[in-house]
Amino acid sequence: MKSCILKSINSIYQIGLRGVGSGRQQEFDEAKAYGSNLISAYEVHDIGVKEVLKKIPDGANYYITFDADGMDPTIMPAVNAPTPGGLNWLQVRELIHGIVNKGRVIGFDLVEISPSFEKGNTTIIHAERLICNLIGAMVRANYFN
């Protein structure tokens, strides 16, 4: 089944990676060998979201899997691997809006939130706002007309 699904995927972009902490070097090497485009959080910080968005092909269907570990822990602290240097709120918002405007988002999921690590509601508030931003961007892009 996995190979059938993978055959229908033209390219994969992983944006906001921060080292090998959540994966072994072999997994990164295999992802690159498969053709995945790996863009670290530091590259996003250095070149900016607009330049990252230029690397993603226009006019495609996009499925976004958002890993909460990729955001800075000041924004998403209730994750399994809170590590400084993640993407900030404005960067993630700009990425979401940029992808919505490049083509068609056909699906979205938000993973790696660990409610047992939450102190207050910081993570869940930001997660909810991300989903609302995605839906709002889709409405403004006339997805539902």
Per-region residue spans from a language model:
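Conserved alpha-helical scaffold segments that buttress catalytic/binding sites
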Residues: 1-145
